[in-house]
């Protein structure tokens, strides 16, 4: 299944003519992967570790930020996330809830748009040192996207990626709506990336 997903993913990237991609590493407590000494733009997954950890040590690639994982679900968060409804939230999805909610992910992504430093914060069990490059997000209304000239197209592209997992999918019949983001994180953790589209 993972191989079929990867084939779809890279075909999707090719069709959308993505100029460049970067990585947002997501660790989880169910899937573990290690990539060591990556010195090129090629990502070569190695044998999974027995410990609940994901690591990219000694990484010199310009598209990957070195980071260290923990034994629970982790993601990129800067220090300026608040509980105020200052930003336009994700589309309301009553089936996605608890700590890993759309609004939490939305604030996480929005908070990294103009952040050029590596910061760490804990919010809804999400924490990750991360140096963002280009970030896209899913929203019902137009919002600024760093280094992007076609924000609406980028958001539409990202929406399609999410929809691929949210809708009933023969590749992943075990998916349940309320588990979609957790499962998505687990799958993306296996290949160690979320697509961050730049200059589409």
Swiss-Prot record:
It comes from the Viruses. Sequence repeats lie at residues 28-48, 49-69, 70-91. Keywords: Late protein, Repeat. Induction: Expressed in the late phase of the viral replicative cycle. Belongs to the asfivirus I196L family. This is Late protein I196L. It comes from African swine fever virus (isolate Tick/South Africa/Pretoriuskop Pr4/1996) (ASFV).
């Amino acid at each position: 299944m993972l191989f079929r997903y990867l084939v779809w993913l890279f075909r999707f990237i090719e069709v959308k003519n993505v100029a460049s991609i970067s990585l947002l590493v997501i660790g989880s407590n169910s899937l573990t992967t290690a990539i060591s000494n990556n010195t090129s733009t090629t990502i070569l997954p190695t044998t999974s570790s027995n410990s609940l950890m994901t690591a990219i040590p000694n990484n010199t690639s310009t598209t990957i930020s070195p980071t260290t994982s923990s034994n629970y679900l982790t993601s990129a968060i800067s220090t300026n996330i608040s509980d105020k409804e200052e930003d336009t939230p994700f589309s309301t999805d009553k089936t996605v809830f608890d700590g890993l909610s759309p609004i939490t992910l939305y604030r996480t992504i929005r908070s990294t748009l103009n952040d050029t430093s590596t910061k760490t914060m804990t919010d809804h069990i999400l924490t990750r040192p991360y140096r963002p490059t280009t970030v896209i997000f899913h929203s019902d209304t137009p919002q600024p996207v760093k280094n992007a000239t076609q924000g609406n197209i980028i958001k539409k592209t990202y929406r399609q990626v999410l929809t691929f997992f949210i809708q009933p999918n023969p590749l992943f019949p075990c998916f349940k709506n309320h588990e979609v983001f957790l499962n998505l994180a687990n799958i993306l953790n296996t290949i160690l990336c979320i697509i961050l589209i730049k200059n589409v």
